[in-house]
Amino acid sequence: WSKPYQEAGYDVRIITLPEYDVRTYIPPENVYGILAAPPCTEFSLLNCKAEPRKRDEVAGMEIVNACMRIINQCNPHFWALENPRGHLRKYLGMPKLNFQPWFYGDPWTKATDIWGNFNIPKRKFENWADVPTLDLYIRPNRDKPNFAYLHKSAWSKIPQLQFHKPETDAEFRAMTPP
Protein backbone atom coordinates (compact mmCIF):
# COMPACT_ATOMS: atom_id res chain seq x y z
CA TRP A 1 0.00 0.00 0.00
CA SER A 2 3.07 2.23 -0.02
CA LYS A 3 3.59 1.79 -3.76
CA PRO A 4 1.59 4.90 -4.82
CA TYR A 5 3.76 7.05 -2.53
CA GLN A 6 6.96 5.57 -3.94
CA GLU A 7 5.70 6.12 -7.49
CA ALA A 8 4.91 9.75 -6.58
CA GLY A 9 8.55 10.31 -5.60
CA TYR A 10 8.42 9.95 -1.83
CA ASP A 11 11.35 8.37 0.03
CA VAL A 12 9.58 5.17 1.14
CA ARG A 13 11.20 2.87 3.67
CA ILE A 14 9.76 -0.57 4.36
CA ILE A 15 10.44 -1.44 7.99
CA THR A 16 9.92 -5.17 8.38
CA LEU A 17 11.76 -8.28 9.46
CA PRO A 18 14.34 -9.57 8.79
CA GLU A 19 16.02 -6.32 7.67
CA TYR A 20 14.46 -4.14 10.37
CA ASP A 21 12.64 -4.69 13.63
CA VAL A 22 10.02 -2.02 14.29
CA ARG A 23 10.55 -2.53 18.05
CA THR A 24 14.11 -1.19 17.84
CA TYR A 25 13.83 1.04 14.77
CA ILE A 26 14.94 4.65 15.10
CA PRO A 27 13.20 6.73 12.43
CA PRO A 28 14.87 9.53 10.49
CA GLU A 29 13.86 13.15 10.99
CA ASN A 30 11.17 14.88 8.94
CA VAL A 31 8.98 11.84 8.26
CA TYR A 32 6.03 12.98 6.16
CA GLY A 33 3.72 9.99 6.55
CA ILE A 34 3.59 6.54 8.11
CA LEU A 35 1.75 3.44 6.92
CA ALA A 36 1.85 0.68 9.54
CA ALA A 37 0.58 -2.87 9.08
CA PRO A 38 1.47 -4.94 12.16
CA PRO A 39 0.96 -8.71 11.91
CA CYS A 40 -2.66 -9.75 12.39
CA THR A 41 -1.91 -13.19 13.82
CA GLU A 42 -2.64 -12.31 17.44
CA PHE A 43 -5.75 -10.23 16.70
CA SER A 44 -7.53 -12.26 14.02
CA LEU A 45 -11.19 -13.20 14.51
CA LEU A 46 -10.69 -16.43 12.58
CA ASN A 47 -10.91 -19.63 14.55
CA CYS A 48 -8.26 -21.66 12.74
CA LYS A 49 -9.28 -25.19 13.63
CA ALA A 50 -6.53 -26.66 11.47
CA GLU A 51 -3.84 -25.02 13.60
CA PRO A 52 -5.27 -24.46 17.09
CA ARG A 53 -3.13 -22.18 19.22
CA LYS A 54 -3.48 -19.67 21.97
CA ARG A 55 -3.40 -16.03 20.95
CA ASP A 56 -0.65 -13.90 22.46
CA GLU A 57 -2.14 -10.42 22.34
CA VAL A 58 0.64 -9.10 24.61
CA ALA A 59 3.24 -10.05 21.98
CA GLY A 60 1.03 -8.58 19.26
CA MET A 61 0.72 -5.33 21.18
CA GLU A 62 4.53 -5.06 21.39
CA ILE A 63 4.53 -4.50 17.63
CA VAL A 64 1.49 -2.20 17.70
CA ASN A 65 3.02 -0.15 20.53
CA ALA A 66 6.29 0.11 18.61
CA CYS A 67 4.37 1.42 15.60
CA MET A 68 2.57 3.95 17.80
CA ARG A 69 5.88 5.00 19.42
CA ILE A 70 7.31 5.78 15.98
CA ILE A 71 4.14 7.62 14.95
CA ASN A 72 4.19 9.73 18.13
CA GLN A 73 7.92 10.39 17.82
CA CYS A 74 7.70 11.46 14.17
CA ASN A 75 4.41 13.39 14.40
CA PRO A 76 3.86 12.92 10.64
CA HIS A 77 1.41 14.85 8.46
CA PHE A 78 -0.59 11.63 8.13
CA TRP A 79 -0.48 8.12 9.51
CA ALA A 80 -2.48 4.93 9.13
CA LEU A 81 -2.33 1.65 11.01
CA GLU A 82 -4.00 -1.25 9.18
CA ASN A 83 -5.19 -4.63 10.44
CA PRO A 84 -8.02 -6.97 9.52
CA ARG A 85 -11.11 -6.36 11.64
CA GLY A 86 -10.49 -8.18 14.89
CA HIS A 87 -9.40 -8.00 18.49
CA LEU A 88 -7.14 -4.98 17.96
CA ARG A 89 -10.28 -2.86 18.42
CA LYS A 90 -10.16 -3.80 22.13
CA TYR A 91 -6.89 -1.87 22.40
CA LEU A 92 -7.21 0.94 19.86
CA GLY A 93 -10.96 1.53 19.90
CA MET A 94 -13.04 1.88 16.77
CA PRO A 95 -11.06 2.55 13.58
CA LYS A 96 -11.42 5.65 11.46
CA LEU A 97 -12.18 3.43 8.47
CA ASN A 98 -13.52 -0.10 8.07
CA PHE A 99 -13.68 -1.33 4.50
CA GLN A 100 -13.75 -4.31 2.19
CA PRO A 101 -10.96 -4.50 -0.42
CA TRP A 102 -13.52 -4.78 -3.21
CA PHE A 103 -14.62 -1.18 -2.44
CA TYR A 104 -11.29 -0.18 -4.03
CA GLY A 105 -11.06 -2.77 -6.80
CA ASP A 106 -9.48 -5.85 -5.19
CA PRO A 107 -11.99 -8.63 -6.02
CA TRP A 108 -12.34 -10.26 -2.61
CA THR A 109 -13.61 -9.65 0.89
CA LYS A 110 -11.44 -9.15 3.97
CA ALA A 111 -12.96 -6.72 6.46
CA THR A 112 -10.13 -4.32 7.22
CA ASP A 113 -9.73 -1.60 9.85
CA ILE A 114 -7.55 1.48 9.59
CA TRP A 115 -6.82 3.80 12.51
CA GLY A 116 -5.03 7.09 12.12
CA ASN A 117 -4.95 10.61 10.80
CA PHE A 118 -5.59 10.40 7.06
CA ASN A 119 -8.06 11.34 4.37
CA ILE A 120 -10.56 8.56 3.75
CA PRO A 121 -10.27 7.58 0.08
CA LYS A 122 -13.37 7.68 -2.07
CA ARG A 123 -14.71 4.23 -2.89
CA LYS A 124 -14.21 3.11 -6.47
CA PHE A 125 -17.10 0.64 -6.34
CA GLU A 126 -20.46 0.71 -4.57
CA ASN A 127 -21.69 -2.60 -5.99
CA TRP A 128 -19.87 -5.93 -6.07
CA ALA A 129 -21.31 -6.64 -9.53
CA ASP A 130 -19.24 -3.76 -10.95
CA VAL A 131 -15.87 -5.00 -9.61
CA PRO A 132 -13.59 -6.69 -12.19
CA THR A 133 -13.17 -10.26 -10.96
CA LEU A 134 -10.40 -12.84 -10.87
CA ASP A 135 -10.74 -16.62 -10.97
CA LEU A 136 -10.60 -17.06 -7.18
CA TYR A 137 -12.18 -19.70 -4.95
CA ILE A 138 -15.63 -18.83 -3.59
CA ARG A 139 -16.89 -20.84 -0.63
CA PRO A 140 -20.19 -22.70 -1.04
CA ASN A 141 -23.27 -20.54 -0.48
CA ARG A 142 -21.23 -17.33 -0.79
CA ASP A 143 -21.13 -14.82 -3.63
CA LYS A 144 -17.63 -13.36 -3.22
CA PRO A 145 -14.13 -14.74 -2.63
CA ASN A 146 -12.99 -14.24 0.97
CA PHE A 147 -9.25 -13.65 1.27
CA ALA A 148 -9.18 -15.41 4.64
CA TYR A 149 -10.18 -18.68 2.95
CA LEU A 150 -7.89 -18.50 -0.06
CA HIS A 151 -4.78 -20.66 -0.21
CA LYS A 152 -1.29 -19.66 -1.30
CA SER A 153 -2.01 -21.28 -4.67
CA ALA A 154 -4.27 -18.28 -5.41
CA TRP A 155 -1.19 -16.03 -5.36
CA SER A 156 -0.46 -16.70 -9.04
CA LYS A 157 -3.92 -15.37 -9.97
CA ILE A 158 -3.57 -12.01 -8.18
CA PRO A 159 -1.40 -9.51 -10.11
CA GLN A 160 -1.13 -6.99 -7.26
CA LEU A 161 0.53 -9.60 -5.01
CA GLN A 162 3.29 -10.67 -7.39
CA PHE A 163 5.90 -8.66 -5.45
CA HIS A 164 6.44 -11.61 -3.06
CA LYS A 165 5.72 -15.33 -3.35
CA PRO A 166 4.37 -16.64 -0.02
CA GLU A 167 5.61 -19.96 1.34
CA THR A 168 2.58 -20.74 3.51
CA ASP A 169 -1.16 -20.09 3.50
CA ALA A 170 -0.76 -17.94 6.63
CA GLU A 171 1.94 -15.83 4.97
CA PHE A 172 -0.27 -15.43 1.91
CA ARG A 173 -3.30 -14.36 3.95
CA ALA A 174 -1.20 -11.82 5.87
CA MET A 175 0.01 -10.04 2.71
CA THR A 176 -0.75 -6.34 2.32
CA PRO A 177 -0.80 -5.17 -1.30
CA PRO A 178 2.06 -2.75 -2.06
Predicted regions and their residues:
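Conserved active-site and SAM-binding loop architecture
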Residues: 1-178
